[in-house]
Curated annotation (Swiss-Prot):
InterPro entries: HAD-like_hydrolase_sf (IPR050155), HAD-like_sf (IPR036412), HAD-SF_hydro_IA (IPR006439), HAD_sf (IPR023214), PGP-like_dom2 (IPR023198), Phosphonoacetald_hydro (IPR006323). It comes from Klebsiella pneumoniae subsp. pneumoniae (strain ATCC 700721 / MGH 78578). The keyword Hydrolase applies. The lineage of its organism: Bacteria, Pseudomonadati, Pseudomonadota, Gammaproteobacteria, Enterobacterales. The active site is at D10 (nucleophile), K52 (schiff-base intermediate with substrate). Mg(2+) binds at D10, A12, D186. Belongs to the HAD-like hydrolase superfamily. PhnX family. Its EC number is 3.11.1.1. The gene is phnX. Keywords: Hydrolase, Magnesium, Metal-binding, Schiff base. Pfam families: Hydrolase. Binds 1 Mg(2+) ion per subunit. This is Phosphonoacetaldehyde hydrolase. Homodimer. One of its GO terms (cellular component) is cytosol. The keyword S-adenosyl-L-methionine does not apply.
Amino acid sequence: MNRISALILDWAGTTVDFGSFAPTQIFVEAFRQAFDIEITLEEARVPMGLGKWQHIEALGKLPAVDSRWQAKFGRAMTAADIDAIYAAFMPLQIAKVVDFSAPIAGVVDTIAALRAKGLKIGSCSGYPRPVMEKLVPAAAAQGYAPDHWVATDDLAAGGRPGPWMALQNVITLGIDDVAHCVKVDDAAPGISEGLHAGMWSVGLAVSGNEFGATWEEYQAMSKAEIATRRERAAGKLYAAGAHYVVDTLADLPEVIADINARLAKGERP
């Protein structure tokens, strides 16, 4: 049938952890613990969506972070430095990720409704497997359990922005056409992942990394601030190539209905 048959969902900022705070705070702590270097939450968010080693590498190349690093050590960050920060990051992230495992509002009901229509639920993450092995059961205990998940270090080919994690979901779930899949993510590398895999890519402008607020902060925000942040986040996701941008996963059923109408007319991603 020429319609959407599977979703490939990101984790932090998409299905769990409103605002994607678990990884950002841990990057700040890991830089401080390993080398006594301060980075801001805003800096920590910039490369979000990449595998965590690659994320640390990208942080080291940010001009402001590189400047601080050069001032302290008289040289650029090396692969050995990245390894040391990653070594600090991993136990911190494993210890903390369960605290950020609650499904985002609307996720559990939306997934149930889409499953009732026959859709399969795949997922992938920038988290490495040891972190996912803590996160997945914690989220399941609170009502969110996808049919499959892939960690950023599972595949020899690598992670985002490449297509491999998304395509591994296609293989495992037995989906016969990548154009019948929707990749949903709150960060640019995940949008690129979906495009590279030949899928429809949908960005989430409010629940994730680009909006960058906790649920409580979001609830207390003025309409003007929400609009400003939403516009900024949506702009980044559209610039990455998103076919659609909505606020949260709860808005996805309307998008899927629109994509199904386009597929029926013979359109492809």
